[in-house]
Design a protein with these regions (language model features):
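Conserved blade-ending motifs and adjacent loop-strand segments that build the rim/top face
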Residues: 219, 332-353
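Bacterial N-terminal signal peptides that target proteins for export
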Residues: 1-9
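Short, conserved, GDST-rich strand-edge loop motifs in beta-rich repeat architectures
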Residues: 167-186, 244-246, 250, 368
Length: 375
């Protein structure tokens, strides 16, 4: 039987690692007492969550399983019909996203790694979901070229108001130069229609030797993307190497610099580039050195914690907390570390339809936790 495990008051710890041009404050949340309530435990490398219209929840496991949580109970049998994934290191099943017309058509979108050790990549498929099984699997995107590394896939997805789909595609680690090449999907955010076709207003449509699905480029390992309806902005975050994790505001056709500019160094300590700025390349709105290893992303618009309205929440794998970023007109003005008392790697963070925050902890014995107001 699961019990409420923590009661705490949000307290800021430090703000020495975030870098932006504008000065920021170290924040705390007076009166933001919270309780952290276990929702599901004993999960096998949980990666993300999907909230369903009927109040149930899909829990996506990297191993290729989708678990259904209904009325507080995780179904012992995973969703049937999930396509085969390439499960190795960071490869596996990443996200499940509901079609904008899911109530009418029952369509979902899955992002996952596919292929073999020598040839693998990020794939997106759509399928029909009847509440228990997937059927009518239709592959709508395969990142090109394939690669021989089991890391840096990206695979986060979000729909825009025009019903086009954005998908993050990582640089493949050993292929970082591809992030600057417009004939490759690696290190890019791509934008496609629901059937996989390319929107006519994509920024590079009509150019020779350019993949028309590319929406932005110069990215590394993107583990979070979201669309803010209030501002119309697309926010994305990505891992640096040793330092240089970033939050960016994404605009079509823009170059976000990797690996020509970076605020980090290589894992060996070697310099990746002499540049932190370069003409024609965008600066992050926020970067972290040393790295926090960001994963999962939500912009809070719930009612349970009104003092956090409009703030960004970023899961931190290495730092083992959730980072709250106070945003004003697209600029960070302060940060706060939350939920570090868990001592867990945070793989995903979402805002639920009930207005609570939901956290996914990483690993072979992962969990889903709900953050509720407390004393």
């Amino acid at each position: 039987m699961m019990k409420r495990i923590l009661t705490a008051t949000a307290v800021a710890l430090f703000l020495s690692v975030g870098g932006v041009a504008q000065a920021q404050e170290t924040l705390s949340s007076p009166g933001a007492g919270y309780e952290i309530v276990p929702v599901a435990e004993g999960l096998d490398h949980p990666w993300s969550l999907t909230f369903m219209p009927d109040g149930s929840m899909l829990i996506i496991e990297l191993t290729g399983q989708i678990r259904i949580l209904r009325e507080g109970v995780v179904s012992p049998d995973p969703v049937a019909g999930v396509p085969e994934v390439y499960f190795e290191s960071q490869g596996g099943l990443f996200d499940v996203l509901l079609d904008p017309d899911f109530a009418e058509n029952g369509t979902v979108y899955l992002s996952y790694a596919h292929g073999t050790p020598d040839e693998n990549g990020t794939r997106v498929a759509r399928a029909h979901f009847d509440g228990a099984a997937l059927s009518e699997i239709d592959v709508i995107f395969d990142a090109q070229p394939t690669k021989d590394t089991p890391v840096h896939y990206g695979g986060r997805m979000v729909f825009l108001p025009d019903d086009t789909l954005l998908v993050t595609v990582g640089d493949g680690f050993d292929y970082r130069e591809e992030a600057q090449k417009l004939d490759a999907d690696l290190g890019k955010i791509i934008r496609i229609n629901r059937d996989g076709s390319v929107p006519e207003d994509n920024p590079f449509v009509g150019r020779e030797d350019v993949r028309p699905e590319i929406w932005s480029y110069g990215h590394r390992n993107m583990q979070g993307i979201l669309y803010d309806e209030a501002s119309g902005r697309v926010y994305e975050h990505e891992h640096g190497a040793r330092g240089g994790d970033e939050i960016n505001i994404i605009e079509p056709g823009k170059n976000y610099g990797w690996p020509v500019i970076t605020w980090g160094v290589d894992y060996s300590g070697a310099r990746i580039s002499p540049y932190t700025e370069y003409e024609g390349m965008e600066q992050p709105v926020l970067y972290w050195t040393p790295s926090i290893a960001p994963s999962g992303f939500t912009l809070y618009r719930g009612t349970a914690f009104p003092q956090w309205d409009g703030d960004l929440f970023v899961g931190a794998l290495a730092a083992q907390h959730v980072r709250r970023v106070d945003m004003e007109d697209g600029k960070p003005v302060g940060q706060e570390e939350l939920f570090g008392e868990l001592g867990k790697r945070i793989r995903d963070v979402r805002t639920g339809p009930d207005g609570y925050l939901y956290l996914v902890t990483d690993g072979e014995d992962g969990s889903v936790l709900r953050v509720e107001p407390g004393e």
